[in-house]
Amino acid sequence: MSEPKLAINEIFYSIQGESTWSGLPCAFVRLKGCPLRCHYCDTSYAFSEGLKRSVTSIVEEVSKLDTRLVEITGGEPLIQPHVHTLMEALLDKGYEVLIETSGERDISLCDKRIHRIIDIKTPASGAADSFLETNYDDLRLNDEVKFVIMNKDDFDWALETTKSQQLIGRVRAVHFSPVMEQAGNSDIAGAEALCPELLSGWVLASGLPIRLQLQVHKYIWPPQARGV
């Protein structure tokens, strides 16, 4: 039987720019492919670019990077069934593993040791109907939830979702992140930036312990830079 393979867009070592691990050195494994076309997507190159690699070769490359923190991302990593083999291989070697997913696929299939970061799509994203509603039932304290906010309507929707799903206390953290300017291309519509100061005011007025999240890596390197 041949070894499981995954379509990999890139593997790189950088500063984690999001989540409660923000600021830490991290190895990133970016998988190819995504069924969504969010207007503000900053990794649309991962929709179609990538090469098949064995799980063993992926783990070997990660082992050469000077960190025990690994994030599996995309694209949408859960569209590739063998991603679960990769998760288990990394976890079994003692890595702390994060996976970022849109929640479009069943998150309950993920190894219980992993930290799931669920990026729930808002109405203005262009993919609001993509979330698998049963995933709310599987959320746990090991998880984090992120909403990328494009405007006040998005904020209000995300706030209501946070309340109705009782996310505060159910997950490790709830992040609200402002959209950064994104040019459109043949795959995505593009988006205008939301002022972080504006979002900060909305978060403060909410009275909830929501985390304002800025993409740290985009303040270090050019926003369109790859491999960071």
Model-derived regions, located:
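Conserved AdoMet/S-adenosylmethionine-binding subsite of the radical SAM
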Residues: 78-228
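Short linear functional motifs in flexible/disordered or boundary regions
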Residues: 20, 41, 50-53, 70, ...
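Flexible, acidic/Gly-rich N-terminal and inter-domain linker regions that tether
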Residues: 1-32, 36-40, 205-211, 220-222, ...
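Conserved Radical SAM active-site core
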Residues: 6-13, 25-28, 36-115
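Conserved residues at beta->alpha junctions
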Residues: 32, 74, 149
